[in-house]
């Protein structure tokens, strides 16, 4: 019934395309009219459109004319030489109808799925121009700095021709230049640069002038699935060094390496013993087995099952599992042990190992044998206490019940217990991360070693991520494992996920070649529809059926054979691999067989542009990781299309169908011919971990001769099912991340709003007074609950609390009056503290010499000091809160064992923590406002002028007496999408008036450096 209606009325997708096609026709009509306009008349359209918008017209009404203007400009640029990335390129592009169609979809907040070579970059110019007419911020998000710079210089020419300004936001742009770039009508940049600038504006800027961004109106995300799907689980983090790091990786690494070696040796022995029995059985034949041998055979298969749990990548195990009968026998043991009645026996069997590795779940578990070995065989490194956490509550009770201790001794003992508990937890955490580094993180798959540093490999793109670090101490654990220098521990200063960052935009859209498989996720999380845009020319690519082999060895032999045959015809070949390790293995095979080739992986990423430029040439063979699978445009050398075009081979099916489609899309661009084929083995991770167990029975029936591919419809379906299973798992993880970050996001918005209010308000004094009043009110609520309850009305306690917070004197019976209500008490306290604050401000302001005020120095430095104190306290306590939230996130995962929902627990406790932060923040800000002092320099104005110093106004600084050190500024140096490091500037003495460099000669004429002379400021 529904199919019949669909044929009559078309799908929603078809109806939308038809509606947009009518708009394309309007665009073309206007384009015809505009061809008669002069250049000046065409350029004047921008001002005309802006005026019409101001007069009430809507963007949708302007769309046909605006898009037609862009199309007309592109036509007039034909033949123009444009300088792009150091080279001159000739403009030869005018948008096709399908590109106009994609531009309409993006303006309407959809994701345009456009095939390789269909001109996504030019398509984006039309909606960028239209939305930039509003004067609001318009951003084009790219996947790397090179594309941001290139697109700004290349297609940005159209926007500049029409009078708009453009800017390229790359990692190399200095902080002081960024505000100017953000003032541009259209800004090109990477997601990480936009995200880090947002974090810096809201967590590091000390004034409104320091903030660079101007809002979030419209964004188009290039390769939107890569950024919003693949990168969604990777938060942007600005981090800095931990002042008191407790890391023990150096101390523990030898012991962990020994434990892992013992596990490996144990599994190798088990596998070797099993192989001997299996070979003996095979030599005798199935008809000559006695009962004892049959028992030995079953025991051998049990050992192999155990080896799979201890070292899943064991070479002996992998070789034996090439035989479908042995694979089936091992699977039988797996089914046996998963039966409910055999759970206890399974536990006893696994206890033979030191540790159990769950390769599919990417987890591990230490057994009792492993714990005992850690204590016994690690040369005194291991300790029983490494796996026993203290119960601080019980320990505190014991201290309180110890009558031999006085109050001071009890407090000291509790501090000692707290310190010991923190040390134990840190040691246990370091131990867990070292084990994870050894058991679950693989060199040349998850990371490479470059310049004696650990460099992460992006699992989706295959590109190296220099500067990015694994979080939670894992990166340091890998550094310890590989014997490179262990970098300092860091803590989070500010963080946000890309999901929540991009959801701040008023309008969001995107473009990619592969989005339909994730359409539901785009709709559910980002409210974005996916629209497939037809191709300009028919796609001539031929996708061959997959070739499936039993073993990797057979698969590689088949690839070698196919490469030789295709190479003889001089067709270019691109071979896509999943990891650096596989690309290097294939390279060795090709070298041994005399095939000249080029390798592109994370170790050769500097040569990417050069290698891709050569990949479309006659007889070229290119082995590449996923780096060549997205965003690269391989152009064919003249004559290659006649040979059949580029031949793309995949060495495995990836866990995501989008990655496979991206690899296929490297060939047959813009109507060129091309072929693609995937080669798969049952040793590939996808099939080994996620394929249906029924495959084993199929293999036993259809096992082909050595070297022959397996052909069975069920296998192809099973591969697709496995991919869907992985995609669903990853989607669940991304959604899980978002649910937790949504809690953080609400808190982040509250803190950043409070911080921006402090920065934006002209006069900080009313804000300071409001904070003092709220603190006095919070204290009153604590000490004045009820007159009828014993201890419920405590005026003396309130007075002592106020004296502890503020340097203000309250008479002994100031609040101890029968007629006073709590509101009156609050007001009395607040009035007295506010009066003291005003006196403090007036006193500090009076310290500024009159001649400095005449030179332009602020007459109210105390206001600046208070503002800076508020900002610094907010930042400091927010950073501490983030650390507590990280710990909470780790802790709540264990609540699932007690049948409690971790997310619900997280929300509940996160709210309590934030409520505590809000109260403590106001209290600390109120306290700190009385603990600063303005210190003016002793030099005379004449001395300063004689020294020829440059005068800087509005630089009033202060000494924070509470911390007994000058304030510090911190600057972020972001290099990556995941982590950025904070550098702390050395603290400088705080002065009012013109600044003198610390290493400059002192203007007093002593001949000494300023830092050794008059710059010495004592804090009284």
Swiss-Prot record:
E.C. no: 7.4.2.8
Membrane topology note: Peripheral membrane protein
Top-rank taxon: Bacteria
Subcellular locations according to the entry: Cell inner membrane; Cytoplasm
Enzyme category, top tier: translocase
Record has Nucleotide-binding as a keyword: yes
Swiss-Prot/TrEMBL catalytic activity: ATP + H2O + cellular proteinSide 1 = ADP + phosphate + cellular proteinSide 2
Entry note: cofactor: May bind 1 zinc ion per subunit.
UniProt-listed Pfam families: P-loop_SecA, SEC-C, SecA_DEAD, SecA_PP_bind, SecA_SW
Required cofactor(s): Zn(2+)
Chain residue ranges for the region called Disordered: 963-992
Any one of the GO CC terms: cytosol
GO biological process: intracellular protein transmembrane transport; protein import; protein targeting; protein transport by the Sec complex
Disulfide bonds: none
Task performed by this protein: Part of the Sec protein translocase complex. Interacts with the SecYEG preprotein conducting channel. Has a central role in coupling the hydrolysis of ATP to the transfer of proteins into and across the cell membrane, serving as an ATP-driven molecular motor driving the stepwise translocation of polypeptide chains across the membrane.
Description of how the protein assembles with itself and partners: Monomer and homodimer. Part of the essential Sec protein translocation apparatus which comprises SecA, SecYEG and auxiliary proteins SecDF. Other proteins may also be involved.
Entry's family note: Belongs to the SecA family.
Matches recorded under HAMAP family: SecA
Protein name per Swiss-Prot or TrEMBL: Protein translocase subunit SecA
Naturally occurring in which organism (per UniProt): Protochlamydia amoebophila (strain UWE25)
